[in-house]
Regions:
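N-terminal glycine-rich "phosphate-gripper" loop used for MgATP/nucleotide binding
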Residues: 68-83, 101
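Internal helical hairpin/lid segments
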Residues: 178-230, 237
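Short internal beta-strands
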Residues: 34-37, 100, 215-222
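ATP/nucleoside-binding phosphotransfer catalytic cores, i.e., glycine-rich phosphate-binding loops
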Residues: 222-273
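Conserved beta-alpha junction segments in alpha/beta enzyme cores
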Residues: 12, 16-17, 161-194
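ATP/NTP phosphate-donor binding region
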Residues: 1-65
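Short, acidic/small-residue loops that bind anionic groups at enzyme active sites
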Residues: 87-110, 118-124, 247-253
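Conserved anion/nucleotide-ligand pocket segment
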Residues: 116-175
């Protein structure tokens, strides 16, 4: 199995790429990981210009030699190329799995809306930098290479539809041409490094857009590294989620085992068989 790796948002390092390749060679020798050189370009905030990031993703996605595309990390930048990318994808792109999370939710959403390939929320190569990161990378490879059900978020049930996003990313997606139809889907959301008031505001925005979308329900993943505000907010992240779900008539289904951490689980978009 050949897995192409690109950076639609921010850059990676060759040293960390070598660590991922070495780990994969030990745990999944049947997988050939190919880090595109674009992953290592640094141009201001981004892994190269918009044109360079777009070209790398489209080239790998359209290359029949690759079975899957693995996004190297998040950050910011994927929304700047997503619409153009979808317009340039050809037949070979339709048979691939696309794996990532965080800012890559922009591309996962766009791919899912366009019916191209199989978008999947899950760990990325950058997670090797975390404590327990080897397990996160191996979990992703177990899914990509073997379709291992143990990699899946534990609440996933066959015969149901799912989607998973970082909440702030989703808040920027709703109301745009990238946003897919989530009718009859269980939506899972997580967040990192946001004040609780910003988390609350994002939930308001997402809920207003999705209150009539026919969601099957919502699960809340981990909300981590919350900055300390100058005064207590007065609600936990779960209480915020429950309040907005109640207000908008969305079934709150409890916790989800996803987040910006090494325990992040795999959530395929769409119908899980």
């Amino acid at each position: 199995m050949r897995i192409g790796i690109c950076a639609p948002s921010t850059p990676f390092t060759r040293e960390d790429a070598e660590r991922v390749v070495a780990l994969s060679a030990q745990s999944h020798p049947e997988a050939k990981l190919v880090f595109d050189d674009q992953c290592f370009i640094e141009q201001d905030h981004f892994a190269g210009s918009d044109a360079q990031r777009l070209e790398a993703f489209v080239r790998l996605a359209n290359d029949p030699a690759y079975d899957a595309i693995w996004f190297v990390r998040g950050g910011y930048g994927a929304c700047r190329i997503a619409e153009d990318a979808i317009r340039q994808l050809k037949a070979p792109a339709k048979s691939k799995t696309y794996l990532g999370y965080s800012d890559q939710g922009n591309l996962l959403a766009a791919l899912y809306k366009a019916g191209i390939g199989w978008p999947v929320h899950g760990p990325m190569p950058t997670d090797i930098r975390r404590e327990g990161g080897d397990q996160a990378v191996q979990r992703a490879l177990n899914w990509l290479v073997k379709g291992d059900a143990k990699s899946l978020e534990s609440n996933i049930i066959a015969g149901h539809n799912y989607a998973a996003f970082n909440l702030m990313t989703l808040a920027m997606l709703v109301g745009t041409p990238l946003m897919p139809d989530l009718k009859a889907h269980v939506l899972m959301v997580e967040e990192v490094s946001e004040y609780l008031y910003a988390f609350d505001r994002a939930f308001f925005h997402v809920g207003e857009h999705l209150k009539g979308a026919g969601l099957a329900g919502l699960r809340l993943g981990r909300v981590s590294d919350v900055p300390e505000n100058d005064r207590p907010f007065g609600e936990t992240a779960e209480e915020i989620a429950q309040r907005w779900c109640d207000r908008f008539g969305i079934a709150y289904l409890g916790e989800a085992d996803i987040g910006h951490d090494s325990a992040n689980k795999v959530v395929p978009f769409g119908l899980v068989g």
